[in-house]
Amino acid sequence: MAYHISGMLQQSPPESSHALDVQKLRNPTVTFWSVWEGEQLAGIGALKLLDDKHGELKSMRTAPNYLRRGVASLILRHILQVAHDRCLHRLSLETGTQAGFTACHQLYLKHGFVDCEPFADYQLDPHSRFLSLTLCEDNELL
């Protein structure tokens, strides 16, 4: 997590970095996953419940040695399935706007996310991009 938070702070000012620290990841509204290859951590991701129908994608990060190997897609697909299994209707995320986030943007757009307005407690910020995906309506997967 220290690597993830440090990376966020290298690309965004502190007031625009919304990464969850370890304590916040322990909140009962957050489910955290990690992908390992043997004893090597390949990537992480989390799902934070905002309410009973809306979740937020958090803490998505791929370890440097695993970039461009499908780890982020694997984690994202797993979180999308869990969100659907929990009957969430919408999954949203906040990410950065700097060039270092281009691969993130491509990943989310590839999986059907679209730009949206700030959600939850977020405010408009030139360093933030907000994306959302409608998962299901009336418990039907879209």
Regions found by a protein language model. Give the residues of each.
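Glycine-rich acetyl-CoA-binding "A-motif" of GNAT/NAT acetyltransferases
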Residues: 29, 37-43, 103
